[in-house]
Amino acid sequence: MQHKKVQMNLYLAFRLLIGTFFLSHGLQKLFGFFGGVDGNGGAVNLFSMFGLAGLIEFIGGLFIFLGLFTSIVAFIASLEMLTAYFMFHVPTGGILPLMQQFNGEPPILFFAAFLVLIAFGAGKWGLERKLLGREIWHQKR
């Protein structure tokens, strides 16, 4: 029983960290936080591909952090990460992240994290479970 409690606590920390980091990328793109996209606080045009990415990252990161529709949001976010990787990172140096000019590791690592979130959902401490009594796509554990 103690082992399962440790697993649940570690998974909660994992979900909160992924949500926070993904949200921070959305804040950077949409509102120019953390130096913005240009290093000087610049934000992207909301009605552009980067604006759509910022919305997915901002809303998706918030929902993942809160544990709200986690699997669905993680699925959408995983598609964004694959798109970012193949459209913007691979053309700068090949399929391997270390060969790329613009560091392709973050989208691949986010993609892997989202696969875990798709598989396991929000977990015990997700807001979705509190509001709906269960998680969509997952049975109560």
Name each model-derived stretch:
Residues 1-31, 47-55, 59, 66-141:
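Extended, low-polarity transmembrane helix blocks
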Residues 29-39:
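Membrane-interface helix-loop junction between the first two transmembrane segments
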